[in-house]
């Protein structure tokens, strides 16, 4: 499966280290640490760079196995989630990639798995090629807190992407508590945008403030009439009380202004949501933006009641590092 036929890539990468995901157990990491698999950036090749263990590689690499068995790494997800698809990425590993890999999962209410933990198969063993993406859809609605990557028998993996939806038990949410309903860790998801030439739309919902311009959403320079936009599905329906539009790191390329439309969408097809969004109500009228600054809007918001989706419009183009939508979840 190639990238064009892997629609699950639009989901959040639950293995992203920026979410707090980390490797908690590993059988071997002689040549390169398993933590590199979880880095958000794309893997790179450094010609002629060696360290004390050998050739420097941007990923996880184990030593050559001289006995029975296989290598594995256990990842604790920063937020529990339901997987929609995975990418086992072996870019730059040629001659030292594993010929096969599989994934297991478990749900630990507390702590990390131990010898008594029961694991379930998430992805049966699949063949791997060197220097390649390996996309596989996952059809399983069970949430996981930990994933175990098995490689057979040894070798190197550049990146492990675990695309899915964060799992949250909203029934345990204290009444009246305001949350960032757009946050990726709360299930918020960027669905569509007019352009993401320089920075992916999903970055808007990442935790914390952006580390650089690349950690935000940025469009190409608009040379035709119109403006850019992005549509976000909230993690849970709710009434918005405050909106934050952050242009941190965007200085000569920030939007002149922005507005937000919103709606309570019931059913329908996500593929049609772009056209539907043209007629959504105005949550935030057009507001002027400044460079490299966090803009918080409260009194400017219109009281629309519970909503499920928003459309952030930026005029005419540019970059925004974060979008925050604080509100009270509409609980049963």
From Swiss-Prot:
Q: Under which EC number(s) is this enzyme classified?
A: 3.5.3.4
Query: Which biological process annotations from GO are given for this protein?
Result: allantoin catabolic process; purine nucleobase metabolic process
**What are the recorded GO MF terms, alphabetically?**
allantoicase activity
* Pfam families referenced in this protein's UniProt entry, alphabetically: Allantoicase
Keywords associated with the record: Hydrolase, Purine metabolism
**Residue ranges of the TM segments:** none
In what pathway does it function?
Answer: Nitrogen metabolism; (S)-allantoin degradation; (S)-ureidoglycolate from allantoate (aminidohydrolase route): step 1/1
Cross-referenced InterPro entries, in alphabetical order? Allantoicase, Allantoicase_dom, Galactose-bd-like_sf
Which transformation does this protein catalyse, written as a reaction?
Answer: allantoate + H2O = (S)-ureidoglycolate + urea
Please state which protein family the record places this protein in.
Belongs to the allantoicase family.
UniProt protein name: Probable allantoicase
Q: What is the lineage of its organism?
A: Bacteria, Pseudomonadati, Pseudomonadota, Gammaproteobacteria, Pseudomonadales
Q: Which gene encodes it?
A: alc
């Amino acid at each position: 499966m190639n990238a064009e036929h892997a629609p699950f890539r639009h989901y959040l990468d639950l293995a992203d280290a920026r979410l707090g995901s980390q490797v908690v157990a590993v059988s071997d990491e002689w040549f390169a640490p398993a933590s590199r698999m979880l880095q958000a950036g794309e893997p790179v090749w450094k010609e002629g760079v060696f360290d004390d263990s050998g050739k420097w590689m941007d990923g996880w690499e184990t030593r050559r196995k001289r006995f029975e068995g296989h290598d594995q790494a256990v990842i604790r997800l920063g937020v529990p989630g339901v997987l929609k698809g995975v990418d086992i990425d072996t870019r730059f590993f040629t001659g030292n990639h594993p010929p096969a890999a599989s994934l297991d999962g478990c749900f630990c209410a507390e702590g990390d798995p131990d010898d008594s933990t029961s694991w379930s198969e998430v992805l049966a063993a699949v063949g791997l090629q060197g220097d390649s993406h390996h996309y596989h859809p996952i059809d399983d609605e069970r949430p996981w807190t930990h994933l175990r990557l098995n490689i057979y028998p040894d070798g190197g993996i550049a990146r492990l992407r675990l695309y899915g939806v964060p799992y949250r038990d909203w029934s345990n949410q204290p009444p009246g508590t305001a949350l960032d309903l757009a946050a990726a860790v709360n299930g918020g998801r960027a669905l569509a945008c007019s352009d993401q030439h320089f920075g992916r739309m999903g970055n808007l919902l990442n935790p914390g403030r952006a580390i650089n311009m690349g950690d935000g959403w940025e469009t190409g320079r608009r040379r035709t009439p119109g403006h850019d936009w992005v549509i976000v599905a909230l993690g849970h329906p709710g009434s918005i009380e405050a909106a934050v539009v952050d242009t941190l790191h965007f200085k000569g390329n920030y939007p002149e202004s922005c507005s937000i439309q919103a709606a309570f969408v019931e059913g329908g097809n996500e593929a049609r949501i772009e056209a539907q969004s043209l007629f959504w109500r105005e949550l935030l009228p057009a507001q002027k933006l400044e460079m490299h600054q966090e803009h918080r809007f409260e009194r400017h918001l219109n009281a629309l009641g519970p909503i499920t989706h928003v459309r952030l419009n930026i005029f005419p183009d540019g970059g925004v590092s974060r979008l925050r939508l604080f509100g009270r979840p509409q609980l049963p």
